[in-house]
Amino acid sequence: MRFYDRKDEIEILQENERQAHDSAVFTVLTGRRRVGKTSLVTHALEGAEWAYLFVSKDSEAALCQKFQRELEEQVGIHVYGQVTNFRDLFKVIMEESTRRHFTIVIDEFQNLHKINPAIFSEIQDLWDRYHNISRLNLIVSGSIM
């Protein structure tokens, strides 16, 4: 796929990926629906180790179960036992990122709030605790209504 007038955005995403090898990076990508946000990220992360997590309108427990499978398949993060809430799953991600670098893309991030209204503050708390020792490149993407 060719991207027109997106060179700067691709370079920023690629630079963030490089920087995250040394310290955690958190990127927020927003835009109208169907403008190519996911395609842009996919192109920018070509060759990187990354996982794509889509926030569907499922229960928190069902999404956590789906995300556990995707994390194991895409970046080799094995979660022992069954995690049923986002906070615990995000903690596993942050702990793993202290040992090695990888990227997590969470698409339709705004939908997490509908499933668990406390999730944004819980993610902020864990990010604040771990980001100084983490090598996670976290990209959250969402649509502007």
PLM features: what roles do these ranges have?
Residues 1-145:
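Phosphate-binding site recognition
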